[in-house]
Amino acid sequence: MLTKTRAVVLKEVKFREQSKICSLYTRDFGRISVILKGGRNLKSRLSGLFCTGSLLEVVLYNRSNRDLQLVSEARIIRSPMTAEPSMERFSAIYRLIEILKISTGNEEKNIRLFNALERTLEKLCAPCRNADAAVAWFMLKLISESGFEPSIEQCVTTGKSILPMLQEGSADDLCLTYDPGGVSLPVPAAQKGPPGQRLPVQVYLLMRTLNRLDIRSIDEIDIPADNSRLLCDILQNYCSLHNNYNPSSKNRRIISRILYE
């Protein structure tokens, strides 16, 4: 069946002399694998289109009983290469693709998640002041759509509203717990709280803001780069744990050195 859909390229692998196999996250079919016959031939109309992180409109022959779908046509909608080169943007897109690969299953359709991904790539494929914050915004949507959205407004251990406690100066640090999933006020040293990650107050406030924000407004707020980067790390660890996956911290450290040292 010949069908049209939108897709984000998650991975590309050379196949034989001139072809390519790609993993795509699509709007209408979830994650699928496709083959581009002759797609590496410079004369092919598919040549140069299927690059990791690109948002495409694709026409493919889709058969439910086939592991590899055949691409007929494609056009680029958004590409990381269209804006001025930026290691910060490339790092953010790499993180976005990494978390998508571990969090989405084959042929699991989720239009709301794809729409959030499309809006995020629209922001990242243009000049963007807050690339890490855009990825953190997407991770919050991904976590929500995956069914393990953390409680952000109320402490998961006491049930108390967190913001009034912070305004009273009752806490310097918080914790993002895994089970139950949510933000927790500090637990006295003599007590054992649920496992989780340290969540600095300023990073918590950023998470709370992004959870309520339209991504189109993300460049209108002043976000310290260290806070958005740390929030990305915390959310990626949270998401990875719920997907029973150990994130590649080595790759993240390498990229951080390139960007910030």
UniProtKB/Swiss-Prot annotation:
InterPro entries: ARFGAP/RecO, DNA_rep/recomb_RecO_N, NA-bd_OB-fold, RecO, RecO_C
Pfam families found in the cross-reference section: RecO_C, RecO_N
GO biological-process terms attached to the record: DNA recombination; double-strand break repair
Keywords, comma-separated and alphabetical: DNA damage, DNA recombination, DNA repair
Domain of life: Bacteria
GO cellular component: bacterial nucleoid
Coiled-coil blocks: none
Keyword DNA damage in annotation: yes
Function per UniProt: Involved in DNA repair and RecF pathway recombination.
Sequence similarity: Belongs to the RecO family.
Protein's UniProt name: DNA repair protein RecO
